[in-house]
Swiss-Prot record:
Domain of life: Eukaryota
Name recorded for this polypeptide: Probable alcohol acetyltransferase
Catalytic residue list: 124 (charge relay system), 295 (charge relay system)
GO cellular component: mitochondrion
Basic and acidic residues bias spans: 327-336
Enzyme Commission designation: 2.3.1.-
Family of the protein in this entry: Belongs to the AB hydrolase superfamily.
Pfam families, per the entry: Abhydrolase_1
Top enzyme category: transferase
Span list, region Disordered: 325-352
Disulfide bonds: none
Gene that specifies this protein: EAT2
Length: 371
């Protein structure tokens, strides 16, 4: 309690850090991707069950617009793509990324929009929120597609989350030097962050949180310079711990009996043997699709991943939900002449070329390789 009080006092003493409200309910920003009309105007197609799409940490709904539209078109169904609290265009508030809070935000969204039996698709951070929604509110969900994460604690990701936050905060410190009317503002921002995140794909992903315009619901706006769509000044070790966490006690004994497709990058350690065992325990009707990819599956295999998602939704919608979920054909396992994913150091696979040594936390690298 004392450390929390001291942290709040320190933040209050810094003029650029705005205090955030504590809200247990936040109305999430969203985009509905409606299926494009059929070329035959005489055919009236009624949209089927809605799909909810949940993005990853430091992401937003705008990152996945094309994929969501493709899924909507191919399944003749609306896709609701959401922004989590403190991401994209959604409101900034405490708690920042607590899984129980994020899940309740999604459940409130489903109720507010009077959606029934949704198919829920989640990637990375969104994958864990999707899993928790399926387990705690099975009456609201028909199926799930889980990409790049598992229902377990993932301490191995902490070192990389710290690197991402450190890079974004370093850019925040340089804001007065980067003017919004400078045509090279994005290149200058990239140069600041490259010291911590040399990988081009990750840099591009993180830079999607920065704009020269005033984003919606922003709490730390400065005219004339770059601005963040996230309250990055408040992202600290508590955020890192929350993202790596999983509420094991909260889901003990819970199962989701509907169909679930898990999409795994075989070069990633996010879904290891322990993760697969947890899937079997909580999601007895899950099936697995492997990709020769790291954790950034959407960046490496965008068309293939989108096809797997669409094909799964089509197939499950043809099945009678009377126990026939097991009729789903499990994708063939791909074999690679490499050690099992959980025995590999994360920095050689999931987030290439991140300078782990530049991080300020002692022992973080050992933690990542031992998990």
């Amino acid at each position: 309690m004392r450390s929390t009080s001291l942290l709040m006092q320190a933040k209050a003493a810094i003029p650029d850090i705005k205090q955030l409200p504590t809200k247990h309910k936040v109305s999430l920003a969203y985009t509905i991707h409606w299926p494009h009309k059929t070329v035959n105007p005489n055919i009236n197609i009624k949209p089927r069950e809605p799909v909810i799409f949940l993005h990853g940490v430091f992401g937003s709904k705008k990152n996945y617009r094309d994929y969501c539209q493709t899924i909507a078109n191919q399944n003749y169904t609306p896709v609701y793509s959401l922004d989590f609290r403190n991401h994209g265009e959604s409101e900034h508030a405490f708690p920042l990324v607590n899984y129980s809070t994020l899940t309740q935000d999604v459940v409130d969204f489903i109720h507010e929009h009077k959606l029934e039996k949704v198919d829920i698709v989640g990637y990375s951070l969104g994958a864990k929120v999707a899993l928790l929604t399926l387990l705690k509110h099975p009456e609201l969900c028909r199926s799930g597609v889980i990409i790049g994460n598992a229902p377990i604690k993932t301490p191995q990701v902490k070192v990389y989350l710290k690197a991402f936050i450190k890079a974004l905060k370093a850019l925040g410190d340089k804001r007065p030097e980067i003017k919004s009317n400078d045509k090279a503002w994005r290149a200058k921002a990239r140069d600041v962050m490259r010291k911590y995140i040399p990988d081009g794909d990750i840099l591009h992903y993180l830079l999607r949180n920065i704009d020269i315009r005033k984003p919606k619901n922003i709490t730390e706006y400065k005219p004339g310079t770059i601005n963040f769509s996230m309250p990055i000044s408040h992202f600290d070790n508590k955020v890192v711990e929350d993202i790596a966490d999983w509420p094991e006690e909260e889901v003990e004994g819970l199962k989701f009996e509907g169909p679930v497709r898990v999409i795994r990058g075989t070069q990633s350690v996010f879904i290891n043997d322990k993760g697969l065992a947890a899937y079997q325990k909580h999601f007895p009707n899950y099936t697995l699709t492997n990709f020769n990819s790291n954790h950034l599956i959407w960046a490496e295999r965008p068309l293939q991943v989108t096809k797997v998602v669409s094909d799964f939704l089509k197939k499950t919608r043809l099945l009678e939900m009377d126990g026939s979920a097991k009729a789903l054909e499990e994708s063939p396992k791909e074999s690679y002449s490499r050690p099992p994913a959980h025995q590999q150091p994360l920095h050689k696979n999931d987030f290439t070329h991140i300078d782990v040594g530049a991080l300020p936390v002692n022992g973080a690298q050992a933690e990542s390789t031992q998990a």
